[in-house]
Amino acid sequence: TTAEAVAAAARAAAAADAAVVVAGTTEESESEGRDRSTLALPGSQDALVRAVLGAQPHTVVCVNAGGPVELPWRGEAPALLLTWFGGQESGAGLADVLTGAAEPSGRLPTTWPASLEGTPVRETRPAGGRLVYEEGLHLGYRAWLRAGTEPAFWFGHGLGYTRWAYESMEAGPAGDGGAFTVRVRVRNTGERPGREVVQVYLERPDSALERPVRWLAGYAAVEAEPGAAVEAVVRVGTRAVEHWSVEERGWRREPGVFTVRAGRSAGDLRLTGTVETR
């Protein structure tokens, strides 16, 4: 039975030095051809994960899914790794990451809710064969920012095998077209070489237009040895400071001061500056 299988897994985990649990979705619960009615992991996977976590303090939970799923035990897991849907070498790649031969340096391209009920756009549903995007510009992480709520994991989130300190940032000046460069100095404060994805977001709280609370303007990946500092150079293009004018049917720029923020995700920003565009 399922209960017996879960109990056997817990016993095996307790007898081991460490445990790895792989959970996720399948083609029966997740597909490109249809929407999901739930974000919960299928079957008794949550019970399995909790049983192993309770039996073995050194447990890594690997989530094999193509999109956000609910992880109600995430606060209990010492390590959580999102593996997505890998190809034929996914097993070898996962082994490299688990053994430390490779660093898990990816970043989330979506925001993960703590629960389906907590998603800001949960009530957006098609009616009469037509889906109206009433949220407008506030899609994805922008919806959470507008609602002022905290997801389980923000867009852009991701950890590796080292730690990073954000030390300084220089933004601008902006050119005639509005584009500018952001230079962010980060330091590897851990004990292993690592890769960091420095993300730059813009804000315009005094705008006369409807805008997201903040939006991604650019990013750059850098690598550094333990103790070393490195500069990430992020090119912010013209389009990042422009807005679409429905009346004029084209991209336009609102002159003024933009707030520039740099950090590790849409919800973890370490440095702040400003740049003025004309």
Task: Tell what function each PLM region has.
Residues 1-278:
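C-terminal non-catalytic regions of proteins with extracellular/luminal or membrane-system context
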